[in-house]
Amino acid sequence: MGKPCHFAQFDLQPAFLVDLDELGQRYRELVRSVHPDRFADAPEREQRLALERAAQLNEAYQTLKSAPRRALYLLTLSGHELPLEATVQDPEFLLQQMQLREELEELQDSADLAGVATFKRRLKAAQAELEREFAACWDDAQRREEAERLVRRMQFLDKLAQEVRQLEERLDD
């Protein structure tokens, strides 16, 4: 038996645009129904199945709540595996990556919290724009390469956003 579709586990149709509040609510309801405490007196097999179901729900939720992971999953569902370490043939984006990294380093060196906040706002706007672009093209077979390019960009910006959060924590201490 294969792994269940992440979307189907939450009674959702595969789509990039997902109501994250609704997803979170469904996740909490479903995970409560398979909580280990509910199976404490159940046979070992039922306990194991509940634990497996909880793990599947968690994996599905973690994937669907993250825009880059959800985008990658949608491409995979449609039969297009994206190589994990694909060479990025996107010189414009490579230049943008270098510029963003340099800017983040400068903000770190100067411990500029206001600058970090501004950088973070720009990053969120860039992420939102990529998400809009991906939503418009992911299910169009003729725009597959564009969708893959956008996923790579989304993954980079997501990683950069994590680094910004870590920098904020260090600067707040």
UniProtKB/Swiss-Prot annotation:
Q: Which GO molecular function, any one, fits this protein according to its record?
A: ATPase activator activity
The biological processes this protein is annotated with in GO are: [2Fe-2S] cluster assembly; protein complex oligomerization; protein folding
PANTHER family from the xrefs? Answer: IRON-SULFUR CLUSTER CO-CHAPERONE PROTEIN HSCB (PTHR14021:SF15)
Q: Spell out the HAMAP family in the cross-references.
A: HscB (MF_00682)
Q: Which UniProt keywords apply?
A: Chaperone, Stress response
What this protein is called in its record is: Co-chaperone protein HscB homolog
Oligomeric state and interaction partners are given as: Interacts with HscA and stimulates its ATPase activity.
Gene3D superfamilies documented for this protein: DnaJ domain, HscB, C-terminal domain
* InterPro entries cross-referenced by the UniProt entry: DnaJ_domain (IPR001623), HscB (IPR004640), HscB_C_sf (IPR036386), HscB_oligo_C (IPR009073), J_dom_sf (IPR036869)
Family of the protein in this entry: Belongs to the HscB family.
Role, per record: Co-chaperone involved in the maturation of iron-sulfur cluster-containing proteins. Seems to help targeting proteins to be folded toward HscA.
Question: Which residue ranges does the record assign to the J domain?
Answer: 5-77
Organism whose genome encodes this protein: Pseudomonas aeruginosa (strain LESB58)
The cellular component terms of Gene Ontology attached to this UniProt record, alphabetical and capped at eight, are: iron-sulfur cluster transfer complex
